[in-house]
Amino acid sequence: MLRKFILGLLLASQAVAQLPHKERDYDSRVYVALSLRDGLDPREFEASVSGLDHGQWTFEHPVGTIPNTYVFSAPKEYAPIENIRDQDRLEVAGGVLAKRELRKREKLQKKYGMSEEDVEKRLVALERLDYDWSERGLGSLEVLSERRIHKRAPVNWTEEEMEYLKEIKRRAEEAQKAQDDKGDKKEDQKDDKKEGQEAQKEGDKEDNKGDDKEDGEEDDDDDEDEDDDDASPAMPVQWKPVDESMYGGMPDDSLYDVYRKYYPDEVGIKDPSLWKQWYLHNVHKAGHDLNVTGLWLRNVTGWGVVTAVVDDGLDMNAEDIKANYFAEGSWDFNFNKSDPKPSSHDDYHGTRCAGEIAAVRNNVCGVGVAYDSKVAGIRILSKEIAEDIEALAINYEMDKNDIYSCSWGPPDNGQTMARPGKVVKDAMVNAITNGRQGKGNVFVFASGNGGSRGDNCNFDGYTNSIYSITVGALDFNDGHPYYSEACSANMVVTYSSGSEHYIVGTDINAIDDKSAAPRCQNQHGGTSAAAPLAAGVFALALSVRPDLTWRDMQYLALYSAVEINSNDDGWQDTASGQRFHHQFGYGKLDASKIVELAEGWNLVNNQTSFHSEVKTVSQKVKYNEPLKSVITVTRDDLDKVNFKRAEHITAVLNLEASYRGHVRVLLKGPRGVVSELAALRRDDRSKDGYDNWAFMSVAHWADEGEGDWELTVENTGEQDQVELVNWQLNVFGEQKDKREENKEGESKPEDENKEGEKEGEKKPEDENKEEGNKEDDKGDQKEDKPEDKPEDKPEDTPEDKPEDKPEDAPEDKPSDEKKPEEKPEEKPVDNSDSSSDSSDSHTSWWPDLSSKKSAWLYGAVLLVGGFIAVIGIYACVTRRNRVRRNRSKDAPSASSFEFDLIPHDDSDDDFVYPEDTHRRSGDNDRLYDPFAEVEDDDDMFRISDEGEDAHDVEPELNRVSMEADKRDNDRQNLLG
């Protein structure tokens, strides 16, 4: 026990050592996040730049586990970049730093009141810093500043919107009053008629009493029929246990007993708020829920999975959270302490979200979707926070935290267009590459609550990322809530507030009164509530298949989604076989379906990507005259990067506009699927246009990628000036498997489902001819695939990493051991069969040379040996060239960084070289950054070409090597 305690302290101290421990003085110092050349010690860099005329820079600390990324600071009065902190982020060096600033000359003068002389001084200082620091190993530079990150809370209505709503309400009241007046008039007529009938009855009563009675009854029936003809047809009424009091408090025993009649008895859960949790099991409207109770009956409850709720804190002492709280994965980054407990009554958001995921089954409030999973709290929303601290937060304990649930982002005001800083991007890349022991963390982001403002989640750099699963909201009636944002990045939707129903469950305890009873809440909502429900569903899937990668989870979410409101015109057929809608993504999450699909899922192949040349357009977009531009992708382009099928598409745009909200951008793929990349936003009056903005879409999933990709830009403002400067197409997808890679163009779709055809083995048909009726027919054994998976789903491959590493290979069939109901792994069975078949004969390690059956083995061995020899020679040559390139001191080379963004520069992707556009596949040791930016091809204020990455073309390699040799000679002369 003591050893475990000491080990825990050591691990905790190591984690804490990566956190900043002192308050920053932003008033007197400038703080920057630097990425340095691979292997360069930050102390060495600090010493090398201290003697330069750029201020006294001090190394502060590394940024978590992000490779080669560090925080430095300097006094503001000596730092040439002091006033960048209050302006647009500066994210690049290596020859393009000053160029970006030069493009902002007019903006700097007008927006920030800088004189022309001050701008010139700034540019000169930046030019010198850019050249000097890049020469000493700087890869990128980002000036850090504190900012507020916004919860996905309901958006307040504007005065204009309130007036509009009042007008709608007034008209509705007038219509209701008119209907009531009509009803009153009809009632008066009915009363008069009845009075006359009664008088007539009374006069004839003695003569025809019996007949009068019958006549009176018939007249009454006629009156009722007349009323029915005028009345509106009755609408079906849904059964509800209660009305106004439905969300007013805890139910009494009688109501609870009534509800129990409609709830599965086998579940056996008695948490008092369970009857309100309609999204877990809806007795009001069958099927309008997560379909999760059947999984609970199978004991699929999230055991072994940890979800980190990145939010405004977590009340770990709440009765519904305490037993499932995971302290090791928790930290308060706002106040730099291990306890993320809220300190304000306003910080309830994270606790409510955590309860949706993992509220304990304990007769308190309700239960979470995955009520046996663990939940951690990472606090970042309670006050302003710098970008590097945010990066630390989303990387915190990424080997222990599996899922990060994020219900926050830029303001949902229909005006903001914001993306995370470079250091945050790098943290996300680090998490999906190295988190969960290399399988990648799963990021779940709420789409946003700005729907009523016309906001769109493609203008949010978090939801617009290929690394995120973007989740929108669905209301009680399976409708689209007014607040939930639509966009082409929406993957799925799930339930939240709407139609007078809410998400209920856990709440924070009283802040000041520790003796208070546990508190439950009845009105959680927005996309803030949808994302945690999705995270809980993903926790269930990971509990049955912990080997799933971050990309596998996206596949599972897509292929298990249930289409809703199928008659809506917004649905489009896609290559995936699933239909897509910008409001609903691929449909609503179904917990049972995603778990069932996960249990038989074969891991996808590694990621690859194709990146087109930057297409320069430089054309004005006239009012109501759409501008079209086409980029054509050929089969040869895709074969070069070992491309099989598409997953995410990004289009990186540079566009100028006098009224950004009046611009609409569409992307039409080869199969005719249309992604609305940029929607109209009435409140977005910005004149900044799009500055290297990467719009992302999941609507083209499973597309082959080959063909014309047509971009359409529309200008809907009659007086507006719009110009499309340039754009670039990026297609991310799955690699072909090994067999297809070696026999390119020969494999048929059906061959992809056969695991027996490994490299060097015989074809199944030849093997069957020779084996005859033997029991060990490997091809037949391995053909079984889940029926609900896409028809071209690949076979098991090494676990997904953006980079290929030899150690990944043995983990290519982890799913078998997780499924006791299935057969054991085929290979051991085959070995036992073959040994039993040959028990009567002489057993030898070597096959009989005279046997035709084994002759192919020797040929295969020779081929493999030759292949290894060729690879070895190639590796030696490549290593020698890489070493020569790494000697360049003007900027880090392509081989210097673990994560190469676009190989035309080190980090910010501002320059794109036309001759280096057919980018690399996942086989290479680089990962493309989907936040990538492109730059027009002008050369103003360009400092040095050596600051860019080495190209793949031979002439460029020779040039870089010669220049590196020359610099080394110059350096020796200076030192001598």
UniProtKB/Swiss-Prot annotation:
Keywords for the protein's UniProt record, in alphabetical order: Calcium, Glycoprotein, Hydrolase, Membrane, Protease, Serine protease, Signal, Transmembrane, Transmembrane helix, Zymogen
EC number(s) from the headed UniProt entry: 3.4.21.-
Signal peptide: 1-17
Biased segments, Basic and acidic residues type: 172-212, 734-830, 915-928, 940-976
GO biological process, one term: protein processing
Keyword Oxidoreductase in annotation: no
Domain spans labelled P/Homo B: 604-737
PROSITE patterns hit by this protein: P_HOMO_B, SUBTILASE, SUBTILASE_ASP, SUBTILASE_HIS, SUBTILASE_SER
Entry annotated with the keyword Protease: yes
Domain Peptidase S8: 277-595
Domain of life: Eukaryota
CDD domains: Peptidases_S8_Protein_convertases_Kexins_Furin-like (cd04059)
Stretches that traverse the bilayer: 524-544, 855-875
Region named Disordered: 172-246, 733-848, 914-976
Enzyme class: hydrolase
A GO MF term: serine-type endopeptidase activity
Residues at the active site: D311, H349, S528
Places the protein is found: Membrane
Membrane topology: Multi-pass membrane protein
Compositional bias segments (type: Acidic residues): 213-231
Pfam entry (one): P_proprotein
Carbohydrate attachment residues: N156, N291, N299, N336, N606, N886
GO CC annotation: Golgi membrane; trans-Golgi network
Main location class: membrane
Family, per entry: Belongs to the peptidase S8 family. Furin subfamily.
Entry protein name: Dibasic-processing endoprotease
Native source organism of the sequence: Yarrowia lipolytica (strain CLIB 122 / E 150)
